[in-house]
């Protein structure tokens, strides 16, 4: 469950314990399962829309334990934050879409794996695995991520058997 995101500076890395696409961002599965398994002490949300909604940000901040630091940032600010914070604090990075995940990766955040936990059905999306759906551009972003040698895995809960994008 450990994924190391390597900073552009050699021999320095951020400890990202989970890099996950989940359109719900903070919810019960993240707080009761993933945060415990990863022993996360920080959650970074990269989302250009959520950052503009003060009410949603407040609700998310109240939904996590006080011993976990929450950073809700725009995608650009999240990239800068991850590059600048090269500490070893166990961190969960959450994004809503594969396009944002790819944007983070293409801007210098190197990852070994990407967890896909929630991409629900909506107009323009087709089911790609169980309850996970993607638009053509989202699927293209997932394929680009995979082509970089990054393990792309569908896994809702830590105890579930993961299914790799490459096996579909």
Labelled PLM ranges:
Residues 8, 12-69:
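Long, hydrophobic N-terminal alpha-helical segment
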Residues 51-53, 78-79, 121-124:
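Short gly/pro/ser/thr-enriched loop/turn and capping motifs at secondary-structure boundaries
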Residues 31-32, 101, 142:
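Generic hydrophobic/aromatic pocket-lining and core-packing "Φ" positions
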Residues 98, 107, 112-168:
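Glycine-rich, aromatic-bearing surface loops/beta-hairpins
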Residues 71-117:
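Ordered, amphipathic secondary-structure segments that act as subunit-interaction surfaces
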Residues 16-19, 41-44, 69-71, 90-93, ...:
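Structural motif
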Residues 37, 61, 65, 70-73, ...:
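NTP/phosphate- and nucleic-acid-binding module
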């Amino acid at each position: 469950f450990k994924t190391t995101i390597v900073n552009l500076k050699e021999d320095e890395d951020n400890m990202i314990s989970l890099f996950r696409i989940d359109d719900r961002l903070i919810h019960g599965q993240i707080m009761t399962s993933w945060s415990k398994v990863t022993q996360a002490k920080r959650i970074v949300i990269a989302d250009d829309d959520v950052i503009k909604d003060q009410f949603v940000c407040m609700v998310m901040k109240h939904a996590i334990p006080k011993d976990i630091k929450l950073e809700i940032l725009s995608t650009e600010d999240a990239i800068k934050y991850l590059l600048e914070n090269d500490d070893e604090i166990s961190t969960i990075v959450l994004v809503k879409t594969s396009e944002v995940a790819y944007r983070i990766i293409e801007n210098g955040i190197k990852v070994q794996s990407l967890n896909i936990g929630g991409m629900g059905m909506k107009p323009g999306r087709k089911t790609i695995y169980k309850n996970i759906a993607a638009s053509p551009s989202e699927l293209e972003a997932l394929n680009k991520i995979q082509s970089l040698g990054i393990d792309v895995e569908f896994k809702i809960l830590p105890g579930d058997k993961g299914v790799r994008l490459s096996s579909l």
